[in-house]
């Protein structure tokens, strides 16, 4: 499948392109408050680098939160606009579920994502499955 993946839930602003289920390019910038300015350019450049049209995509995956409210709105708006324009399925991807995929631990544990100041988003997991 040809999938465009968009990340905007945190300070990371980025996108990845998967062609035939293989990651062919990833472009991300770890800098706060640049999503509105940079994310459309990142997506444009990814597609341009691989001579792709939006209509050639079979799905658009986008981080669905929790995370930065403004970042999520920007990422979701871009993804939804592209999906609607190309009549392509939109695939929401929960942020905590993705972070949990990198953990191989049994028992109960928490996945945390910095929110702002001294606040975090958290979700409890039990042996890899959501527990809250």
List the predicted regions and their residue ranges.
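Surface "functional belts" at beta-alpha junctions
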Residues: 22, 34, 89-132
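Generic, well-ordered alpha-helical segments
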Residues: 31, 35-38, 70-74, 92
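Short amphipathic alpha-helical face segments that pack within enzyme cores
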Residues: 38-41, 77, 98
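Phosphate-handling active-site elements
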Residues: 48-55, 84-93
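N-terminal beta-alpha supersecondary unit
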Residues: 1-64
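Glycine-rich nucleotide phosphate-binding loop and flanking beta-alpha elements
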Residues: 12, 68, 117-119
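DPxDG-like acidic metal-binding loop motif
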Residues: 59-90
């Amino acid at each position: 499948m040809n999938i465009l993946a968009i990340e905007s839930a945190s300070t990371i602003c980025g996108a990845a392109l998967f062609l035939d289920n293989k990651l062919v390019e990833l472009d991300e910038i770890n800098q706060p408050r640049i999503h509105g300015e940079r994310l459309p350019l990142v997506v444009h450049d990814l597609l341009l680098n691989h001579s792709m049209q939006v209509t050639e995509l079979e799905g658009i995956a986008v981080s669905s939160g929790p995370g930065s409210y403004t970042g999520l709105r920007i990422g979701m708006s871009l993804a939804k606009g592209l999906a609607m324009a190309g009549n392509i399925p939109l695939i929401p991807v929960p942020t905590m579920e993705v972070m949990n995929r990198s953990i191989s631990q049994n028992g109960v544990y928490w996945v945390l994502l910095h929110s702002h100041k001294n606040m975090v988003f958290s979700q409890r997991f039990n042996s890899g499955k959501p527990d809250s």
